[in-house]
């Protein structure tokens, strides 16, 4: 991978644990935190995909809020406005994975420009990064807001090429979401899939270039390959 000149990371589920909202959900709905988090994330993604197909873009905060309303209705849980806001805000305070900071620090030390490309709005990306004290880490924070469509639309991945300033074949795309990794590969990025759950990759034509178990393994592999 000596031709890699920069790296772009997915945010939700790759650098940050989306299920770190379980605690906030559990505080409001004891015994339901895990079920809420999992269905909430599932519907959040479904709404981004469906809105892209329908040409009805809203920002990620709105998609997340709508997914939470569905989740609570489906699970038979009462959701007042105050609780809705409290839980939605939890998505702005996600916890980085334990290996995120060290992996990013090692890649920066190797001289690689780093970026995030996310379905999140500019505001939400900046808040997640700031709230976790990771402002030092990234050269580019890239939002789908600039093209008004969500991943896996190819226009999103094109943003990374433009903002990072390198040809797509020289930008490593890193994601733990198999559908995202496949779409990025289809666009033309070399792709590293973070397979934390030891799962099967989606049966789509485009496959990742490299598969690892976590960000620590990814940074070790890449830095060693650059030597």
From Swiss-Prot:
EC supergroup of this enzyme: hydrolase
UniProt source species: Pseudomonas putida (Arthrobacter siderocapsulatus)
Statement: the UniProt record of this protein carries the keyword tRNA-binding: no
Record family assignment: Belongs to the HAD-like hydrolase superfamily. S-2-haloalkanoic acid dehalogenase family.
Domain of life according to the entry: Bacteria
Listed name of the protein: (S)-2-haloacid dehalogenase
Annotated positions for site Important for catalytic activity: 14, 151, 157
Subunit structure: Homotetramer.
Keyword Hydrolase part of the UniProt annotation: yes
Reactions this protein catalyses: an (S)-2-haloacid + H2O = a (2R)-2-hydroxycarboxylate + a halide anion + H(+); (S)-2-chloropropanoate + H2O = (R)-lactate + chloride + H(+)
Known EC number: 3.8.1.2
Biotechnology: (S)-2-haloacid dehalogenases may be used for the biodegradation of halogenated substances and their derivatives which are widely used as pesticides, herbicides and other industrial products.
Record-annotated active site: 10
Role description: Catalyzes the hydrolytic dehalogenation of small (S)-2-haloalkanoic acids to yield the corresponding (R)-2-hydroxyalkanoic acids. Active with 2-halogenated carboxylic acids and converts only the S-isomer (or L-isomer) of 2-chloropropionic acid with inversion of configuration to produce R-lactate (or D-isomer).
UniProt KW keywords: Hydrolase
């Amino acid at each position: 991978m000596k031709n890699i000149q920069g790296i772009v990371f997915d945010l939700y589920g790759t650098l940050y644990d989306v299920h770190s909202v379980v605690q906030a959900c559990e505080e409001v709905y004891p015994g339901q935190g895990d079920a809420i988090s999992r269905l909430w994330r599932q519907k959040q993604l479904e709404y981004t995909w469906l809105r892209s197909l329908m040409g009805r873009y809203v920002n990620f905060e709105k998609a997340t809020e709508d997914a939470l309303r569905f989740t609570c209705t489906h699970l038979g849980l009462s959701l007042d406005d105050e609780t809705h806001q409290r839980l939605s805000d939890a998505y702005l305070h996600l916890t980085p994975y334990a290996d995120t900071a060290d992996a990013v620090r090692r890649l920066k030390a190797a001289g690689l420009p780093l970026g995030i490309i996310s379905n999140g709005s500019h505001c939400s990306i900046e808040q997640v990064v700031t709230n976790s004290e990771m402002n030092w880490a990234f050269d580019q924070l890239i939002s789908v807001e600039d093209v008004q469509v969500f991943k896996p639309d190819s226009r999103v991945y094109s943003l990374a090429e433009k903002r990072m300033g390198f040809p797509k074949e020289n930008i490593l795309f890193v994601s733990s979401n198999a559908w995202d990794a496949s779409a990025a590969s289809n666009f033309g990025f070399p792709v590293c899939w973070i397979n934390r759950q030891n799962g099967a990759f989606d049966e789509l034509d485009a496959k990742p270039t490299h598969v690892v178990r976590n960000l620590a393994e990814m940074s070790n592999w890449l830095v060693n390959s650059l030597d």
